[in-house]
A protein has these predicted regions:
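Extended polybasic, low-complexity segments that bind anionic RNA or targeting/receptor surfaces
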Residues: 1-121
């Protein structure tokens, strides 16, 4: 039996439930991994900067951030990035580089199996 979700943020509880359901339906472990990371305390969430995205993600990759993406650094290539939250500075820099920001549900609709998704955080 899984642990109950003890979050009070209704949006976050809904996102975690969607991720777990997608993992059950498709058998893709990537969605379950992100759901478990978001179920943890918020102080333990990933908060990578754009410089980390530029450093570690291959060009044109689909990146999944289980937390908040921050705007320090420059983005050298266009990426599709899904994150729970994105700072305003990061949003501007991603769009200026020709990248795309999407929600977890948009990413799950486009890539249900989660193949080729890079978890950064």
């Amino acid at each position: 039996m899984s642990n109950p979700i003890r979050k009070t943020n209704a949006r976050l509880v809904d996102v975690i439930s969607q991720l777990k359901a997608q993992s059950r339906d498709t058998g893709a472990a990537v969605w379950r991994d992100v759901a478990m990371r978001l179920s943890k305390s918020r102080k333990n969430w990933a908060q990578p900067n754009l410089s980390r995205v530029s450093r570690y993600a291959p060009e044109g990759a689909t990146i999944l951030v289980p937390g908040k993406l921050l705007g320090s650094g420059e983005l050298s290539a266009s990426h599709s990035i899904a994150a729970y939250s994105v700072s305003n500075g990061a949003r501007e820099k991603i769009e200026a580089a020709g990248g795309r920001i999407m929600t977890y549900s948009e990413l799950m609709n486009e890539n249900p199996s989660g193949t080729g998704v890079v978890i950064l955080g």
